[in-house]
A protein has these predicted regions:
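N-terminal hydrophobic targeting/anchoring segments and the immediately downstream early-domain regions
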Residues: 1-136, 140
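Substrate-binding cleft of carbohydrate-active enzyme catalytic domains
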Residues: 141-148
């Protein structure tokens, strides 16, 4: 397989809609997606959402696989299995705990949008008039993300 189509924000698919959504994605040529597991949710809710994807992958290994590396994504696509890339649309689940960057990474998180519309511990979102950018904590989060 030479080309892989990845939905950069697959908000329409979740573990509960797998059986109905996957046929549409396959017909559309989508092999993988950044599956949103959190945006403004608490740490606990985000962990639960990630766990639902791992559970779905365990229950339906012929349909979905949680991937954490590019070779895994390519292999899943070549096998006709949807590759789910764990994604946050905001860093709210981190709270102000830098160690949670590592914890979520261990759970499979590979893409995290830093802010989602409003100001938070990491920085200002796009709807904030002051446009203050990243906070000190936000810069630490970015640095840690680059290290892992």
């Amino acid at each position: 397989m030479s080309a892989v189509c990845v939905d950069g924000c697959a908000t329409g698919i979740n573990p509960r809609t797998l059986t109905t959504e996957l046929p549409h994605l396959k017909r559309g040529g989508v092999h993988a997606g950044l599956v949103t597991t959190a945006a403004l949710e608490t740490t606990e809710v985000a962990v639960g959402a990630i766990n639902q994807w791992w559970r779905a992958a365990r229950l339906h290994p012929d349909q979905v696989r949680v991937v954490t590396r590019v070779p895994e994504l390519r292999a899943a696509a070549a096998e006709g299995v949807f590759a789910a890339v764990i994604h946050f649309q905001g860093s709210v689940p981190l709270g102000t705990d830098l160690e949670l960057v590592d914890a979520f990474h261990r759970l499979g998180l590979r893409v995290m949008q830093l802010t989602y519309n409003y100001a938070g511990p990491v920085g200002d979102g796009c709807l904030e008039e002051r446009d203050a950018g990243l906070t000190r904590f936000g810069r630490q989060v970015v640095e840690r993300m680059q290290q892992i």
